[in-house]
Amino acid sequence: MRRQNITIHGSTGTIGKSALSVIAQSNNQHKVFALSAKSKIKTLFNQIKRFNPKYAVVLDEDKAKQLSDLCVKNKISTKILHGVESYEYISSDRRVDCVLSGISGTSALKPTYAAIRSGKKLLLANKESLIMSGELMMKAAQKSGSQIIPIDSEHNALFQILSPMFKTSQINLKKRKDIAQIILTASGGPFLNF
């Protein structure tokens, strides 16, 4: 079986670190193709040393230069890129099989959409992308064949509960009467004690 190439957005955050931990234990089933982070250069550099991705991306050009200098100094061949366009590039590169979107907030919108448009399997921890542009994202997924898998706790629980029903045609959401309402309780975030 061919190893799956994966891009991890937000690799220095909690979800990204957890994903890399799983990959490290996956018996070479996955290859880290690219990593991205906002600003934690030291953590990202350590991840680059361990996983040897083809690309690493940070938003800021100065931080990208710092990271590039560290890689050159340590004879590491990972190509360092910067900017939102580079986030999109590592989401849509033809060699990528799977994209994990672990970036928080609205900055995940463009790389997430790029992954979906390119037909990638998308492991989505970022809820904001669907909240802001759900209809656009779902239409793009239908057109490209992209599979979107929610990996954040509550959303993944719903996915695990509902997806077997979709596979056996027990529910038809197009009629919008098989499931009238889904209620998510707040387990964290800004609305926990609201």
Provide a role label for each language-model segment.
Residues 1-56:
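N-terminal Rossmann-like dinucleotide-binding module
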Residues 12, 48, 99, 119, ...:
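Residue-level signal for inorganic ion chemistry
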Residues 57-59, 79-86:
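Short acidic-hydrophobic, aromatic-tinged amphipathic segments that line or gate anion-handling sites
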Residues 67, 105-118, 127-146:
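Rossmann-fold NAD(P)-binding glycine/threonine-rich loop
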Residues 82-114:
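Beta-loop-alpha module in the N-terminal Rossmann-like domain of NAD(P)-dependent dehydrogenases
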Residues 137-155, 181-182:
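Rossmann-fold dehydrogenase core element
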Residues 157, 161-194:
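Conserved anion/nucleotide-ligand pocket segment
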